[in-house]
Amino acid sequence: MRLSVLFSTYESPRWLEKTLWGLHEQTHDDFEIVVADDGSGETTAAVIERLRDEFAARGVTVRHLWQPDEGFRKCRILNRAIVEATSKYLVFTDGDCVCRADFLAVHAARAERGHYLSGSYYKLSMAASRAIAREHVRTQACFDPRWLRANGMGEGVRRSKLVR
């Protein structure tokens, strides 16, 4: 099943990069990424451009939709992303979320015409968020309770919705 992954970003290249790392590790291969940029500068564009070739090698298209920074207009650029998406199934996330490798596979497996599939997020501490490196996403270590506790998340993470 072909999916379009849409998310917004604004002047957060560090978190955008981590979001793209998570999407790069997806076990489901039939998707495109549409980044809805609400007026970020050149650093954001550079992150997208740097990773675009890696996605292309997997057959995944990454499109960067940009609008000038004229204040908070996130909804406008997301609406444009919806219009420009090429699949009939849209998956929304955020530009600071790191998706588990099975995120899109679960969406594809559970998709049902006429229904919405809703998920949630788990807010990490700033220490844990900063500690996430590409290798942690590649190996999925950043979703392991031991890694999370070692990086400032505390004991409650074992019972969280983040881990299986």
Label each PLM-derived region with a short phrase.
Residues 90:
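Short aromatic/hydrophobic "clamp" motif used to bind/position activated sugar donors
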Residues 22, 37-48, 97:
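A conserved acidic beta->alpha catalytic loop
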Residues 20-21, 45, 87, 101-112:
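Short alpha-helix within the catalytic core of nucleotide-sugar-dependent glycosyltransferases
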Residues 68-85, 102:
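Glycine-rich, basic loop-to-helix element that forms the pyrophosphate-binding segment
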Residues 30-42, 63-67:
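Short beta-strand/loop segment that forms part of the nucleotide-sugar
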Residues 21-30:
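Short, acidic, metal-binding catalytic loop of nucleotide-sugar glycosyltransferases
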Residues 2-4, 32:
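Cell-envelope/extracellular polymer assembly enzymes that use nucleotide-activated donors
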Residues 102-140, 148:
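Conserved donor NDP-sugar-binding/catalytic core segment of glycosyltransferases
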